[in-house]
Design a protein with these regions (language model features):
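NAD(P)+-binding Rossmann beta1-loop-alpha1 motif at the extreme N-terminus of oxidoreductases
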Residues: 1-50, 63
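Phosphate-coordination loops involved in phosphoryl transfer and adenosine-cofactor binding
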Residues: 2-5, 86, 136
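Short acidic-hydrophobic, aromatic-tinged amphipathic segments that line or gate anion-handling sites
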Residues: 48-54, 167-168
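Rossmann-like NAD(P)-binding element
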Residues: 53-90
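Rossmann-like NAD(P)(H) cofactor-binding subdomain of soluble oxidoreductases
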Residues: 76-127
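Internal alpha-helical scaffold of NAD(P)-dependent oxidoreductase catalytic cores
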Residues: 133-219
């Protein structure tokens, strides 16, 4: 079979969007879901899908993408080991260290390169998916030592063809970063929604843009939010401690002086810096040969400083560097 064959295990929001986007980019795709109703919906939309993981993994040369919630990874991997032990394997799970450890333990012969598209909505399920979900998004591609350069290039190429740009990162650095910018926001949104509701009917009647924006992700499926937050416990605890320290300082200042200048100004400057970095043109570039001995280390270094991969040709990648 062609190397541009993709098998997606799990057809919810992210897996379903991946199936759609990859098919639109010219990949031959097949999806697998446990639910017969989901498979019927996928087939009705014109895609190849099955409830049988053995059937889904029948193409020996397919790139296999795990798109299941973190707790289900350890249930799926033994079946991958049984039917496709030497496969090219990636995933779209939002926590990377537990997945990498599970792959090493349960499918040690797989050629694994992890992934995480930083995209989503508060909705879930196949019907919520979209072929354009990843357009303009960051897509982490795991760049730990030992990653197969051919598989790395294929996973990065898939992300690029789905409309994303690639951020090369090590698993530990990824988990620490997303604890702050993804998992903590989900937790804070849950707290904010509860605090607002605690104000009763009047508070809810007056709630407007700031409350709606701040609590959007609190509408996500609770089981999925718990899975990613609890699965990144150590990194999230550090982020929570940082947030509590800042809230404590704000409370202390408000109680003692009535002022919140330091907290509000720090947040304002941080948001402006984020917007500026996102909008700044990237004029500096670098090319990396993925077969070079230090390629992965260099990719991690550049990724940690905001660089992104914008093209991959065979085993050479082209990066735009942060200004």
């Amino acid at each position: 079979m062609s190397e541009r064959t993709l098998c997606v295990i799990g057809l919810g929001l992210i897996g379903g969007s991946l199936l759609r986007a990859a098919e639109g980019a010219g990949w031959k795709v097949r999806g697998m879901a446990r639910s017969a109703a989901v498979v019927t919906a996928v087939r009705d939309a014109g895609f190849d899908a099955t409830t049988s993981i053995e059937e889904a993994l029948a193409d020996d040369d397919a790139l296999v993408a795990l798109a299941v919630p973190l707790p289900a990874v350890v249930d799926v991997l033994p079946m991958v080991a049984r039917h496709a032990p030497y496969c090219r394997l990636t995933d779209v799970v939002s926590v990377k260290q537990p997945v990498a450890a599970a792959v090493g333990r349960l499918v040690p012969a797989a050629r694994y390169v992890g992934g995480h598209p930083m995209a989503g909505t508060s909705a879930s399920g196949w019907a919520a998916g979209s072929a354009t979900l990843f357009t303009g998004a960051s897509w982490v591609v795991g760049s730990d030592d030992g990653a197969d350069p051919v598989v790395w290039a294929q996973v990065a190429g898939l992300a690029l063809e789905c409309g994303a740009h690639v951020v090369p990162v090590g698993t530990a650095d990824h988990d620490a970063a997303v604890a702050r910018v993804s998992h903590l926001p989900h937790l804070l949104a849950a707290v904010l929604a509860s605090v607002g509701a605690g104000g009763g009917s009047l508070a809810m009647a007056l709630a407007a843009g700031s409350f709606t924006d701040g609590t959007r992700v609190a509408g996500s499926q609770p089981e999925l939010v718990r899975a990613m937050c609890e699965g990144n416990r150590d990194a999230l605890l550090a982020a929570v401690d940082d947030a509590l320290g800042r809230l404590g300082a704000a409370r202390g200042s408000l109680a003692s002086t009535g002022g919140l200048a330091a907290t509000i100004q720090a947040g304002h400057l941080a948001r402006r810096a984020f917007d500026a970095a996102r909008d700044t043109a990237r004029d500096n570039t670098e090319h990396i040969d993925l077969t070079a001995p230090d390629a992965l280390a260099r990719l991690r270094e550049l990724g940690n400083h905001g660089a992104r991969v914008v093209a991959v040709h065979d085993t050479c990648c082209h990066l735009e560097l942060a200004s």
